[in-house]
Every structure is written in C-alpha cells, then in structure tokens.
Amino acid sequence: MPERLFCQVCSAPHQYLYFNNGKERSQVRCKLCESFTPVSQRYRKPAKYFCPHCEHPLFLWKQRRSTAVYKCDRDDCSYYLANRKKLNKAERLLFLTKSSQFRLRYNYVECHFTQEELVHSAPQKKESGNIFAIRNTLHTLALILTFHISLGLSARKTAFVLRNVFGVQASYQTVLNYSEMAAYHCHKFNLAHKGEADALQVGDEAYAKVAGRNWYAFLFLSPLRRKITSYHCSPERDERAATTALREAIRTVPKNAQKVTAVTDGLSSYVPAAQYINHTENAVLSHKQVIGLQNLDTESETYRPFKQMIERLNRTFRFHTNPASGFKEANGLISITTLFATHYNFLRPHEALNFEVPCPLDQLKDIATLQGKWAKILRIAASLT
C-alpha cells in the first residue's frame, strides 16, 4: 500500500487501508470508517457549456461522428420541470418505468464540421459534358427531359417513345447519360434563378435506393410561392446533411427579415442544424417541429398545414423517381433530383398559384411547348458555366 494514501473521510493512514477492487487496484477502503478513496485523483476539466436555464454545467452525454451532445442533469432545472408538467397522466405513468423514452432535459449539440464542409450536393460533370456536342440535336435532348423528367417516364419507356413515336434512335442508356449531362448545367441554373425565399421554410426527407442502400433527399419548400429552395442528397440523415439543406433553403431569404422559421418533422438532426446556423451566421432562425399524425400540442396544430405541403411535394417527388427503381450511383439520384427541382420550379403550373409556375421567367413566357422550354433553360444554364 503506498504510504501517500490516507482515508479522505477519517484521515486514517495507509496501514488501515486495503485495495477494494481486485486487480485494478484503483480504489482503497478504510478499515475504520469503511469509506472508499480513489488511488489517483480525477483531473476535472472546466465545464465547456452551461445550461441557459439553470446555469448548471453540461456533461458530455453522447459522442458521434459529426456531433457531441451535452446534457443538463440537474433535477431542479426550470426547463426540465416545465417539460415534466406538460406530461399527461398516461405519459407520467410511462415515465416512471421508461424515462429514456422522453426528452425532457436541456441538450446542446456541438457540431464537428465547418461551414466550408457544408456543400450542397451537385451533379458531377461527365467527360463528354458538352450538351451542344452530342450526336443528337438539342431538340431531342429536350424531348428526353420532357418525357423522362416532366412526365415521369422511366428511361426505357422514354427510349421506347422516342423510337416508336418520333423515330429517334436512342437507347435507355442514352437517356440516362443525357439526363446527367443536363443536370450538371441545370443545378447552377436552379441556384441562380431561385429568387427570394419566404421567411417560412418547410422541409422533409424522401429516400431512394442507391446501390442497394438508402439515400436521402432533403427537400425544402417555400409555402407562399410553392417553390423548392433546397434539394440536398446525402447517404445519412445526420446533422451535417440537415444543416447543409437548411442553410441553402434560407440563403436567399431577404436580409431585412426579422425572423425566419423552419418547420420540419421530429427528426433530431434539425435541432442542432438550427442551433449551428444561429451560432455561426448570426441568424434569427426559429425551428418548429410537427410530431406524429395527430395534433397533440399547439405547435403541431399551428404548423401542420405547412407539413402537409411538404408531404405532397414528397409524393410528387416519388412519382418522378420511383420509375427508376433505384440507382447504381449517387450521381443518378442527385441528377434526377436536380432536374425534378428545375421542372417543379420553372415548368410545372400550380393550382394554388392560379396555374402559374412557382418561379416565372420572362425568357420562357412566349414558349408554348415543354420541350421548347427545356431547350431554352439548357441554353441559359450553359451560359452560366
């Protein structure tokens, strides 16, 4: 027994101490008062974060790849007590046995990524990416986008229509290649002509199969003009992907907007995303969550109509992506998502807008056909790159 050790309760010397935890020999026990003393003192680091409600130090609760979660464990914290009071009778009984099913304590999520890493997904440029140097005409490319994107036909059905209706010899692989070439240019067109976004944004995720595994498309919508403001694709539904999508959605919100509101479902990744944007960009972003299918709280009741808008957008998105039956590469999903956003914002009339498109352009007003509008969009997009 080291002579430097003594009981921290009754100050008994080392002769009255013995190791209490076997081979680890990291804890001793006093023979006189039977209290425990560690062999080596813990080094306590100063607290990194504090609870804004009770000013109690937060402890590291969970460590993830892109985030670290800090939690307040004080039982008399005003935030915790207020959430306890909101529980109904059934929830209080459940809380006695399954307290881990409730999120009542204050959490703070520290993000491990930088603003430079928050890059919106974009289609890759193909080696033969010049849409004006293809073997077919620009009109044929516009026809492919009309049937494959605007009408939601699969690549094989699109090739069938071209061969048997228009007499154009094109394989389904040609349809896919041309779509990816066009998506590279349309992505920059979408970002350049998105216009001002509403101070209220609503978002949700849709999934698709890429090489047999789930990928997620984070879609954000402006409820007033019904236009897509963000369409980020990611293999994970983590905080980094949610932050990237939300950051792009509010990028064109007017600077004089006093308050920006983001409405999402109960996905936990959106909470640290809103915190990160408020912290790094000095934004005034308010995050609202619509939980479940029933209005069990006032927040869900107030913002559920906006959540239903994004659900209808997801239904439309799946109509255009389901014919693909999955993708071999991520670039396929990113490309069709980009082209869908182009179609939805600039070509698809909306009943709520008196059958106008969400993002009207003067260059497209005098063009009557969809293929003509696609051709004009490609010309404008090519001039941006």
Q: What label would you give each PLM region?
A:
Residues 28, 266-268, 276-305, 309:
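Conserved beta-strand -> loop -> alpha-helix junction used to position metal-binding or nucleic-acid-contacting
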Residues 302-328, 333-337:
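Short amphipathic alpha-helical "interface-anchor" segments enriched in bulky aromatics
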Residues 257-271, 293, 357:
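Acidic/histidine-rich, metal-coordinating catalytic segments
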Residues 180-181, 231-255:
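Active-site beta-loop-alpha junctions of metal-dependent nucleic acid enzymes
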Residues 1-29:
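N-terminal alpha-helical interaction blocks
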Residues 323-385:
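C-terminal domain-tail junction helix/linker
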Residues 11, 34-200, 205-211:
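Short, positively charged, Gly/Tyr-enriched micro-motifs
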